[in-house]
């Protein structure tokens, strides 16, 4: 066995290689890192601008939310570094444990003194310094487990329904937990991403269509089972008819887009953020981006998010070429997750989709979302670094 093949085999078996860890990994994808940095800069600027009025109303310091957002970015960077250094084998081997931890967290939101209720939803755990939104952790946990599960059952996916049903049963358990919180947006993202990962793992399109036919009635029932969801559905079709009731938020979001025009009214000059548009610094921050930077600024943000998703799929493709199936599926899953969540958030703010409480990745204010998105991107960077290392040893790059 040649020295090159020997090193490659030891790497795949997660054995020690004489070089230091940082020396045996390739530098992560530059496009991924640049998009990551760009979204952080945009998020910092836009949260600073969009939160000024909210801070004043809540009698907080002018830059209260901006300072906290900066702390979230710094703290998340530390956890992202740790996530990067752990390596992909850690996530594959601990997938069940991570999934169990996420499910436990979803149960603890009902525990008195620990669970936090906000606007009637039980989504947060009180950890003292921060309220952790467990759903953000659960999304990543489900996708890590799905990648490990599909890798383990690779040979059976083409001819057996059993592994598919097993995965859907786990997904259904988490979907039920999100239904009870309630958090319909996260439920949609998880179910759609798992189905996407099944497709990318090689499950035939006919099986997926059959699953879609079976799942669709359940999703429709969830959508219409609660009166407030049904009102959201009817409101987004014609928000102006309900502009002083259920359509108030969407109408003011659309006004933001109208005021922004092509080039925007200028940074810090938004009118809608002054208590006209609820959640201006969180779920509806894209509306303020459109108002202050115009269509041009909104398209730039969308382009950065699209490039980020593209790089995730490119990383997954390279990992697949290097026969790293778990890494490949996880990269695809992260790409699907970030793409779907961005699409839904932008769709909601533009009136293309009913209102849902999903953040714009890395831009919206919120520690839990920033933390888990940063960890997910760090895992992507690790997947890319490992795949490039193997490709370099095999002489493929």
Curated annotation (Swiss-Prot):
Keywords: Cell cycle, Cell division, Cell inner membrane, Cell membrane, Cell shape, Cell wall biogenesis/degradation, Glycosyltransferase, Membrane, Peptidoglycan synthesis, Transferase, Transmembrane, Transmembrane helix
Main location: membrane
Periplasmic compartment residues: 48-69, 118-126, 181-185, 229-294, 350-359
Source organism, top-level taxon: Bacteria
GO cellular component: cell division site; plasma membrane
InterPro entries given in the database record: Cell_cycle_FtsW-rel_CS (IPR018365), FtsW (IPR013437), FtsW/RodA (IPR001182)
Pfam families according to UniProt: FTSW_RODA_SPOVE
Pathway in which the depicted protein is active: Cell wall biogenesis; peptidoglycan biosynthesis
Protein name, per record: Probable peptidoglycan glycosyltransferase FtsW
